[in-house]
Amino acid sequence: MSTPAEDKLVTLIADSARGPQREGLFALWLVVRAAEALLPPAPVSAKNHRRRLQALETRIGSLALPAPLKRALAAARQHLETATPNAAALVLSQLTAPARDVLGVEAADAVTVAARSARLHL
């Protein structure tokens, strides 16, 4: 089951041409997906979350991302290690500005929707 933010990011990925923009959107989608998976009503298990973070680190490391986005995603991954809904909400709110600066307003709007939803779950 996907969230409105995930759906919007997947649509943006599908509409973008190959290149750094598409890879940035894909990386953002991966992080948003990992963060939203920590939120109630059905958060993932700690073991599953650790696996997701390991896969996330491997996948993001292989992408050609603009430096500001790469730094933001690395920081987000570190915050997600605590595996709490509060960490997920923090990560989503902190990703809005880098998403807007690097990927555009539509990507930032998708992250903003996810951040608002996360705050409602706290």
Q: What positions do the PLM features span?
A:
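Charged/polar interaction segments and conserved charged motifs
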Residues: 1-2, 57
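Short terminal alpha-helical segments
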Residues: 2-49, 96, 114-121
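General structural signal for secondary-structure boundaries
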Residues: 20, 59-62, 74, 93, ...
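Amphipathic alpha-helical interaction modules
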Residues: 25-80
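Amphipathic alpha-helical binding modules
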Residues: 77-122
